[in-house]
């Protein structure tokens, strides 16, 4: 209850790793749209991101170095540059399942999202 009060959210889900968190997020997004009767399949992720080593997490990772040995991965992922709201808006369609973004990227260097780009993601 304290965690949700601090975050402004109504639920929390604990994971052992970032990979588990990404897999859970993917499943939550699919379940959400399924519950609404929609089958959305597209994922928008940020370039130079790394989300883990499971098939789902690797599918959302842009670096071919990590992806190539495990292909074919999940399809339907579009990568956009960090801090480019126009590219983000162009990538999001009626079929978008989720937007995957780290508040602070670590794979491409320690790069926090700008407040304006974070706000664009929330839109």
Q: What are these model-predicted stretches?
A:
Residues 123:
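Active-site loop/helix belt of alpha/beta enzymes
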Residues 47-105, 109-120:
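PLP-dependent aminotransferase-class I/II
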């Amino acid at each position: 209850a304290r965690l949700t009060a601090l975050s402004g959210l109504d639920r929390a889900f604990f994971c052992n790793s970032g990979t588990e968190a990404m897999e859970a997020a993917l499943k939550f997004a699919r379940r959400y749209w399924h519950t609404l009767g929609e089958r959305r399949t597209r994922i928008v992720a940020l370039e130079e991101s790394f989300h883990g080593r499971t098939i789902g997490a690797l599918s959302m990772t842009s670096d071919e170095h990590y992806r190539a040995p495990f292909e074919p991965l999940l399809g339907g992922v579009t990568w956009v540059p960090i801090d480019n709201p126009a590219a983000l808006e162009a990538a999001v369609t009626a079929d978008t399942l989720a937007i995957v973004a780290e508040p602070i990227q670590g794979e491409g260097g320690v790069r926090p999202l700008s407040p304006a780009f974070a706000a664009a993601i929330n839109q």
